[in-house]
Amino acid sequence: MIIEVFCDGASRGQGQKRIGEAACATTIYRNRKKIAQFARGLGPRSNNEAEYEAVIAGLLICSMGDLLNPVIYTDSAVVANQINGKWKCRNDSLLPLLMTVEDIRDEFNFKVVQVERSFVWEPDALANEFLDTLEKRKTPKTKDDVV
């Protein structure tokens, strides 16, 4: 059985800190057939935090569904290289997320692969659609909507 988990995070942050409204999404395939998809808002987060949250969500779904030995695909070099032990994590906001992934790794095996952005198009679209929906809710439609 082949389990593939496609993950992506998105943040609408601007400026130097790049923290803004964020969302994560994941799609899961078993033997090339989609069996699950998930997206959720995260509040104010960086893009790297959102990318980690997408991986964690995918892993948790796999662990609950007995989907063993998944291959996790992410377009984030930071996330892939930190999880695979190639890069050290020096960011205080990412370290707890990396530790969560390591705790999950104690439960079952998985492989993390960095891919081109086009490879994770589906969760990318889900995460951005989620953020678009949030923005539409916050945008006043008439002058009476402005407080």
Tell me the role of every PLM-derived stretch:
Residues 44-51, 90-94:
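Active-site beta-loop-alpha junctions of metal-dependent nucleic acid enzymes
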Residues 136-147:
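Flexible, low-complexity interdomain linkers flanking nucleic-acid-processing modules
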Residues 10-16, 21, 56-127, 131-136:
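RNase H catalytic domain
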Residues 25, 80, 143-144:
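Low-complexity, intrinsically disordered short peptide segments enriched in small/polar/basic residues
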Residues 2-4, 121, 127-128, 145-147:
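Charged, low-complexity, intrinsically disordered terminal regions
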Residues 7, 50, 123, 143-144:
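Intrinsic disorder/low-complexity signal
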Residues 1-49, 60-64:
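RNase H-like nuclease fold core
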